Amino acid sequence: MKSKGSMSTYLAPLKESTILAMSNLLSANVDAGLKYSLSMGYHDDPQMRTAFMKVLTNILNQGTEFETLAETVMTDRYEKVVDMFVGMDLNIALSLCDVCPASDIEDAANALLACFASRGKTLDLLKAVIRKEVENTDSETELLRRTSIATRLLSVFARHNGADYVRSVLQPVFTKLAEKPPEERTFELDSSKVGSGEDVSRNKQNVINATEMFLNAICESANEAPRSFREVCHCILTSVRERYPEAMYTAVGAFIFLRFFCPAIVSPESEGLIKINTVISREMKRGHLIATKVIQNLANNVLFGAKETYMIVLNDFLTNNIYKVTNFLREISEVPPPATTVLPDGRTIVEDVRPEVRPMEQKDYNCLHRVLFDNMERISREIAARRIRQHLDPERAAAYKQGFDKFSNLMAQLGRPPETTKPEFNGLRSYTFAAANQL
């Protein structure tokens, strides 16, 4: 039989391992762990009390380390939520789009795009949302023009993915306009607002010249557009063509002009298209605005009428340029095949056209968490209604329900979202632009 001393030596590593194991267990959930183990600090056996004190000391010493562990656990949970959110045949994501209140459109659009971009599936989301928006639009005049999460998604997508494109197209135009002499930088056409010393006929020519500069730059840029832009335009065109064939190009124009180029022309400083601290004169701002009105009418394939009679003098210019704009909308809606390069040794390299994957940041997780938490009941009801509308067979319906139940459990594990100040919904700048300027 081993002596008492040798037994202590033998058990010492086991004792230390037990203390370490308990330290790790308690640190993983301090609140629950201490609730059941705190009484060990008052145990009759002094060795138990000593062991507990060592456990408590380890927890305090390793606090920072386990905070990192807790963050990792939360990130893992968020990633599982994102996987299910992006998966499940887009049903959860599309349900959120259906039930999202106006006050959540901004955050929901940002959260949706962040999630799908992190899995390289942004275009899958946009194509599904575009098709659904077209199906739910009762009038071709409203196609991609009403305030909805679909139009907001397109605007956020354009802003995130088109910064370099819009800069390369429009920045040279703004530079040239700024270099023109003062007499070529007056654009008012409304005779009741024309300043002293200004001539309406000269202003009309200035408007035509400036608008032509913007139009030529835009209409010659189809091949510069990001491939993802052209895929979105192609999806809009094909989706609209099935239901409103006469409106397919104007629908593409609603995206590429109303939600992309026109807001940048009206507010070039917000897109970094002019030098910092550059002051744009009132006359030049008016010129930018009138140019966008002309371009938008071209995109809509309509002439000016009784609503703004002073703009009717530009109808000949519109008539002469409608074909140019329509041709541009057709070109940008064509998705080119991947480029190929033949190497000297005969091997062929095909262009990688896979979408860019952008990892989510903590602010993206927080935004997604809040939007889902606030809308979970609505999403649940919509998911249940979808099962009924789709007339699923019992086996598929059960799998559908099981998947959403798993998603709900993951959300329950996340608990309440972090407290953040929810921004007031101000609407999209291009919505405001469109409403204010009757485009």
Language model features: what each stretch is:
Residues 1-439:
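Extended alpha-helical scaffold/tether regions of large eukaryotic proteins
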